[in-house]
C-alpha cells in the first residue's frame, strides 16, 4: 500500500512540475511584473527591472537543459532589450548564430518546429531588436546590433540598410556605400530607395534626390 501511495505521489509531482521548455517559458512569463511610473505630465506602466532579471535567470536555467531551443534564446534577446542591455543581447545573438551555423539540425522553435531558413530568422529578429533601440533613440545600442547583424549577414538588405542608418545618424557619407549595395541586391526595396533619396537630399544633390524620389513614387506608392 505504501509503495502504491509513493508511486501516485511521484506521478502527481511529475505532472505538476513537468520539466519541459514550455513549462520554463511559462515560469519566466509569470515572473514578469509591471509597475506604475509617474512623471511630471503622465502616468504609465512599465516592466519592473527586478522581474525582468528574474525572468532572464529562469530562461538561463531553461537553456542549460534545452540548449537547442532557439525561441528561448530569442526570449533572452527580447528580455534584455526591455532592460536596454544590448551587450547581453549581442552575446545571445552570438550564441544563436553559432548554434544555427554548427548545430542547425538540432535547433528547434516552439512545438519542435525546425528552422528552414536560419538567415531569414536571424535577419527578422535582429531587425526587431535593433528597431526597438532606434525608436528609443538609443543610438549606441542600435549601432552595436546593426554591426553584428552585418557581420553575420553581409548580403542582407536589412543589415546593409541598418548600417546605412547608423552612418546617416552620424552624418557620415559612407551611408551611400551600404545603400547602393542594398539597392543592387533588391532594387525594389522601398525603405532603401527612400533612404537613398534622403541621403542625396541632405547632400544637396537635387538631381539624384529627384531621381530616387520618382523611383519611390513609381515602385512604392502604387
Where are these regions (language model features)?
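Canonical positions in the second alpha-helix
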Residues: 62, 95-96, 148-149, 181-182, ...
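Structural signature of tandem alpha-helical TPR/SEL1-like repeats
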Residues: 50-57, 84-92, 134-145, 169-181, ...
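Terminal, low-structured helical/coil segments at or just beyond the last alpha-helical repeat
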Residues: 22, 27, 195-222
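Short coil turns that delineate tetratricopeptide repeat
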Residues: 67, 101, 154, 187, ...
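N-terminal leader/linker segments that initiate helical-solenoid repeat arrays
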Residues: 16-73, 91, 100-102
Amino acid at each position: 500500500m505504501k509503495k502504491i501511495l509513493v508511486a501516485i505521489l511521484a506521478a502527481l509531482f511529475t505532472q505538476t512540475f513537468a520539466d519541459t521548455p514550455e513549462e520554463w517559458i511559462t515560469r519566466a512569463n509569470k515572473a514578469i511584473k509591471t509597475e506604475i511610473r509617474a512623471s511630471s505630465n503622465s502616468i504609465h506602466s512599465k516592466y519592473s527591472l527586478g522581474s525582468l532579471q528574474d525572468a532572464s535567470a529562469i530562461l538561463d536555467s531553461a537553456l542549460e537543459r534545452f540548449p537547442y531551443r532557439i525561441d528561448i534564446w530569442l526570449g533572452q534577446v527580447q528580455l534584455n532589450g526591455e532592460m536596454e542591455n544590448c551587450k547581453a543581447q549581442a552575446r545571445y545573438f552570438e550564441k544563436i548564430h553559432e548554434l544555427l551555423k554548427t548545430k542547425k539540425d538540432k535547433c528547434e522553435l516552439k512545438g519542435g518546429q525546425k528552422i528552414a531558413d536560419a538567415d531569414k530568422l536571424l535577419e527578422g529578429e535582429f531587425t526587431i531588436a535593433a528597431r526597438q533601440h532606434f525608436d528609443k533613440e538609443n543610438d549606441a545600442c542600435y549601432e552595436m546590433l546593426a554591426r553584428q547583424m552585418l557581420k553575420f549577414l553581409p548580403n542582407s538588405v536589412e543589415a546593409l540598410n541598418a548600417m546605412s542608418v547608423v552612418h546617416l545618424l552620424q552624418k557620415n557619407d559612407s551611408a551611400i556605400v551600404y545603400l547602393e549595395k542594398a539597392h543592387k541586391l533588391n532594387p525594389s526595396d522601398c525603405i532603401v530607395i527612400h533612404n537613398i533619396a534622403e541621403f542625396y537630399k541632405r547632400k544637396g544633390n537635387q538631381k539624384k534626390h529627384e531621381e530616387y524620389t520618382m523611383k519611390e513614387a513609381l515602385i512604392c506608392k502604387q
